[in-house]
Structure formats: structure tokens, C-alpha cells
From Swiss-Prot:
Transmembrane segments: none annotated. It comes from Arabidopsis thaliana (Mouse-ear cress). Its main location: nucleus. Residues 135-149 have a biased composition (Basic residues). Signal peptide: none annotated. One of its GO terms (cellular component) is nucleus. Residues 112-149 are annotated as: Disordered. Keywords: DNA-binding, Nucleus, Transcription, Transcription regulation. This is Putative B3 domain-containing protein At5g35780. PANTHER family: B3 DOMAIN PLANT PROTEIN-RELATED, TF-B3 DOMAIN-CONTAINING PROTEIN. It is found in: Nucleus.
Length: 307
């Protein structure tokens, strides 16, 4: 009788241990599943687009366009100072090649203006893409107007050495920018149209570019768009504009064909989607002289603005 009781007790103990083991396995599997969901969630967050991280200001003329879905409430967030933590963090560090930023900047204090015998003076993938863009835009303007497209006048600039301002290097170090030489691409005196709130854009004519090799092939493809397409499928390239006080704004950079009453048209780049906030934040007015430089921060195109 005693042996029978001990046997039952042993069976009960074994059953309890098996039950505990099963519970432990279930708990471990649940924890692993939660970790997997967390990893997937992080990957999905890292894949979100530039315009999700830097929401643009909704304009009334753009309400019906598809990209309003990125900001359905129409809230204006472009006026806020951008947080560097919002910039894409999953940029490939192997290609970034920026272990020590101070060393690559030594000796990079100068850039040269080129004689613009042709706006596309550099034979690169980006300039060839720009040439294709110009041909398409010319055809689009010609279809809307019977007149001929006005040819860009060649502007010959004196060959001179321009020293990069020290504040540009300081901003690059502050933003932990990619190790590359900052490039001066544009200088101009602002007109009334550049600071008019109803237009909210900075016009950058092709023929006034100092250099045009600052776009990647992917960015060239992103700004290609048929001007007759009302859907505006191309939303341009997301960029960051930064001033001398390291204050930043998220803007859109794209191509724009400007028509004239004569039937002629010109091709330009524009910076918009928040340009009014840049004007207010820097106190810009007609007659001010500005300079635009370029560099990249984790692959994102950045424009230092000197006033």
C-alpha cells in the first residue's frame, strides 16, 4: 500500500514538472514573438519617406493632390525647427565613410566658379539626366504655347576662387555631415517674387547655376515630371535648408517650367513647401544677396544659406 502511494506521488510530481515546462516554453515563445514584432516595427519606421519625417505645409491649391495623404489633418509643421534625430538614421554607415569629420575637411576651404559656356558643363550621370529633363520640359512648354522656347543665355562668369565660409564647416560638423567638399552652386540678389508669401518659393534659374553636379541619378529621376500632368505624381526631392545659426527647415527641391506672355519659357529649380518660413526666420527681403551651398547629411541633400 505504501509503495502504491509513493508511486502516485511520483506521478503527480512528474505531471507538475511537465506542466511547468510547458508554461515556461509558452512564456519564452511569447517573449520571442514580442521581440520579433518590435524588430519589424523598427524596420518599418526606418523605411518611412523623407516627407513623413519632415511634413510639408499644406497649401490650399494642393489639397486635392495625392500627397496630402501624408498629412491628412493639414497641420503646418514646416515652420518648426528640424530635429537632427528625425533625419533618417538607417543610412548605410559603410558607405558614409565619416569616422572622423575634422580630418577630411582640412584643405577643403575653397571652391571654384566655372565658366558657364554650357549649364551642363560636367559630363556626369546627373548632368546627362538634367539634359534629358530640359528636353522634356521644352516639349511640354511648346505643346501649351505656339511660340518657341527661349534659349538660355550663356552667362560668362569670371574665373575666381571662392573660399568656403567657416560657418559652413561648423554646421557640417554639428550635423555630422558626410565627408565631402561643400559646393557653392548659386548666388543671386532676391527679387520681390522670391519673398512674396503668395508664391512661397525660391527661383533658381538653370542659366544662373554655378554648377549642376550636386544631384544623384536617383534624385534626377525623382524630379522628372511632365508639367501637363495635373496629378503632380512627382513630389520632388526632400532637402534640408540650414542657416548660419544651424536652424533648419525641410523643403522640396524640384524642376519648374516658367511660362511668359511672349510664349517663351525658361526652366528653373525651385525650393518650396516651407519657403515662407525661411523668409520669416531669416528676415529676407528684396535686394538681399544670398548664396547657396550644398553638402549631404546621411545621404540627404542639404543647402546652407548665406545671407
Amino acid at each position: 500500500m505504501t509503495m502504491y502511494d509513493l508511486t502516485d506521488s511520483g506521478k503527480d510530481m512528474c505531471s507538475s514538472l511537465c506542466l511547468l515546462a510547458e508554461v515556461a516554453v509558452m512564456v519564452a515563445e511569447e517573449e520571442q514573438f514580442r521581440r520579433l514584432l518590435k524588430t519589424v516595427s523598427k524596420e518599418e519606421d526606418s523605411d518611412k519617406s523623407f516627407f513623413y519625417r519632415f511634413p510639408r505645409k499644406i497649401r490650399s491649391s494642393l489639397v486635392k493632390r495625392r500627397y496630402t495623404q501624408q498629412n491628412p489633418n493639414g497641420a503646418s509643421t514646416s515652420s518648426a525647427v528640424l530635429d537632427l534625430n528625425l533625419i533618417t538614421t538607417d543610412y548605410d554607415l559603410k558607405t558614409q565613410q565619416n569616422p572622423s569629420f575634422d580630418e577630411p575637411l582640412v584643405g577643403l576651404g575653397k571652391t571654384e566658379k566655372k565658366n558657364l559656356t554650357n549649364p551642363n558643363y560636367q559630363s556626369s550621370s546627373s548632368s546627362s539626366c538634367l539634359t534629358e529633363n530640359k528636353s522634356r520640359k521644352r516639349r511640354a512648354v511648346q505643346q501649351r504655347k505656339s511660340g518657341k522656347l527661349k534659349k538660355a543665355r550663356v552667362v560668362s562668369l569670371p574665373r575666381m576662387s571662392i573660399e568656403t565660409p567657416e560657418w559652413v564647416f561648423q554646421v557640417m560638423r554639428y550635423m555630422n555631415a558626410d565627408a565631402e567638399t561643400p559646393r557653392l552652386i548659386f548666388e543671386r540678389t532676391l527679387f520681390n517674387s522670391d519673398v512674396k508669401s503668395g508664391l512661397s518659393r525660391l527661383l533658381i534659374p538653370f542659366q544662373q547655376l554655378i554648377r549642376n553636379d550636386f544631384l544623384t541619378p536617383a534624385e534626377c529621376r525623382a524630379i522628372q515630371k511632365d508639367e501637363d500632368n495635373e496629378d503632380d505624381k512627382n513630389i520632388g526631392v526632400g532637402t534640408i535648408l540650414v542657416n548660419q545659426r544651424s536652424k533648419m527647415w525641410g523643403l522640396r527641391f524640384k524642376i519648374w517650367a516658367m511660362e511668359k506672355d511672349s510664349g517663351h519659357g525658361t526652366l528653373n529649380y525651385i525650393l518650396n513647401w516651407g519657403w515662407n518660413d525661411v523668409v520669416k526666420g531669416n528676415g529676407l527681403k528684396a535686394g538681399d544677396n544670398i548664396s547657396l551651398w550644398t553638402f549631404r547629411c546621411r545621404g540627404v541633400l542639404c543647402f546652407p544659406l548665406e545671407t
